[in-house]
């Protein structure tokens, strides 16, 4: 469950290392985001030679959350960290590599490029 002011790790090679959620997209009163949801975030830590800079406002999709995700088959899954992948205006990832596993719910959101780049889909 990601909400405003939540800090997230970045799971791609766009140059950013840490994001802070500004807003959860998808409704005027929407408070929480989970795996597969898009957020607006600010870059808090970045590499000096990366594609994104510190302070830049970006859109990102959540790929991992510490809060467990309940699946339709009765199972649940949780990850060790909250992580996101930075998107461009066409909802494609800025980076060319994805680090770590991603949740299967990312596929249902239409982010097939992220699913194909990910080393593991859980």
Curated annotation (Swiss-Prot):
Q: Name the InterPro entries on file.
A: Ribosomal_uL14, Ribosomal_uL14_bac-type, Ribosomal_uL14_CS, Ribosomal_uL14_sf
- Which keywords label this protein? Ribonucleoprotein, Ribosomal protein, RNA-binding, rRNA-binding
Gene Ontology biological process terms in this record: translation
Between which residues do disulfide bridges form? Answer: none
In terms of SMART domains, this protein maps to:
Ribosomal_L14
SUPFAM superfamilies listed in its UniProt record:
Ribosomal protein L14
Which Pfam families does the entry link to?
A: Ribosomal_L14
Q: Does the keyword rRNA-binding apply?
A: yes
Question: What is known about what this protein does?
Answer: Binds to 23S rRNA. Forms part of two intersubunit bridges in the 70S ribosome.
- What family is reported? Belongs to the universal ribosomal protein uL14 family.
Subunit details: Part of the 50S ribosomal subunit. Forms a cluster with proteins L3 and L19. In the 70S ribosome, L14 and L19 interact and together make contacts with the 16S rRNA in bridges B5 and B8.
According to UniProt, the name of this protein is Large ribosomal subunit protein uL14
């Amino acid at each position: 469950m990601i909400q405003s002011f939540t800090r997230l790790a970045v799971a791609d090679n766009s140059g950013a290392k840490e994001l802070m959620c500004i807003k959860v997209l998808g409704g005027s009163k929407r408070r929480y985001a989970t795996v597969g949801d898009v957020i607006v975030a600010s870059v808090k830590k970045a590499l000096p030679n990366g594609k994104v800079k510190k302070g830049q406002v970006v859109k990102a999709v959540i790929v991992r959350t510490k809060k467990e995700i309940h699946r339709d088959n009765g199972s649940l899954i949780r990850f060790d960290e909250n992580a996101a992948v930075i998107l461009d205006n066409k909802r494609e990832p800025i980076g060319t590599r994805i680090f770590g596993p991603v949740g299967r719910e990312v596929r249902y959101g239409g982010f097939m490029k992220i699913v194909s780049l990910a080393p593991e889909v859980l």
